[in-house]
Amino acid sequence: MLRLSSAVLIAAMATSTASAEGLYLGAGFASVNAEEPGYKYGSTNILGLIGYEVNDYLSLEGELSVAISKDKIRIASTNVEIGTEHMGAYAKLTLPTAGPIKPYARFGMARAEASATVGSTTVSVNDSAFSYGIGAEWELSEQTGIRLDYTAADYGVTDASVLALTSVFRF
């Protein structure tokens, strides 16, 4: 029974390969937030995305964001400007639906960098962590879509999250 179930699943995934396969690019905006004991901070970032649809169910993605607006927090009597940037590599698992809304989950590894500026001095720290999230894409056509996703990572002492709105273009 297990062999039959496995064979049916593999056959279903293989037949879907012809309908969804290829390169896609995305660009959008993200709200990147981090929380450490005693501090919360975030930034507004521009986001770039590159991915490859293996089939209707599986895609591989790379993502990069750069801060365009940083947060300001007060530590003791000093104002600190702080922002977070990230890059990640993900496997995206899509639930095929009959309509234009395609929900998905993704998981992978992310590397984040937080930089704090006081006056003319900037200090940066970076770390890598397992990252996971959920989202959905609204397919406007076979070539374009808009997606909204939430991704989280735990960097030990720091918890981080990314809420992104991205336009997707398929080739």
Regions found by a protein language model. Give the residues of each.
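Residues on the lipid-exposed face of transmembrane beta-strands in outer-membrane beta-barrel proteins
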Residues: 29, 48-52, 89-93, 109, ...
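Residues that define the transmembrane beta-barrel architecture of outer-membrane proteins
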Residues: 21, 42-46, 81-87, 124-130, ...
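Outer-membrane beta-barrel strand-turn architecture
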Residues: 19, 51-56, 95-99, 111, ...
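Predominantly the C-terminal beta-signal and adjacent terminal strand-loop region
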Residues: 67-73, 128, 138-171
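Cleavable N-terminal export/targeting peptides
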Residues: 1-22
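Transmembrane beta-strands of outer-membrane beta-barrel pores
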Residues: 29-35, 44, 64-70, 95, ...
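Extracellular loop and loop/strand-boundary signature of outer-membrane beta-barrel proteins
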Residues: 34-37, 74-80, 117-124, 150-153
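Repeated loop/turn-to-beta-strand initiation elements of outer-membrane beta-barrel proteins
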Residues: 23-25, 57-62, 99-103, 138-148
